[in-house]
Amino acid sequence: MKQKKLPPIHPGEILKEEFLDPMGISQYRLAKDISVPPRRINEIVHGKRSITADTALRLGRFFAMSPQFWLNLQTRYELEVTEDNLENRLDDEVHVLQAQSA
């Protein structure tokens, strides 16, 4: 029996649930403090926008952490969404390279 997978978690959900809400920081304040339009943060939090390198650098500096953390969240999310969309097609469409004997 195939295990049911949990849906991928958008980085915006992590931003909101693990950073903004516990720290009492509004989306508007974050946007102003990192010098981006408030709409950008709102769209990220609602899963309608990706975290770009620019945004990752700003979030990293604001939260005193690696910008790579934010990019890794985004990359992992995109990989999981794509994997879910492709489902079993990869098995049919991609042939694994076979090692050649010497």
Spell out what each predicted region is:
Residues R29-A31, L59:
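Short alpha-helical "recognition helix" segments of helix-turn-helix
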Residues S35-I51:
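Recognition helix of helix-turn-helix/homeodomain-like DNA-binding domains
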Residues K48-R61:
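Short, basic-rich loop-to-helix N-cap that marks the start of a DNA-contacting helix
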Residues N72-A102:
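Short, charged recognition helix plus adjacent turn
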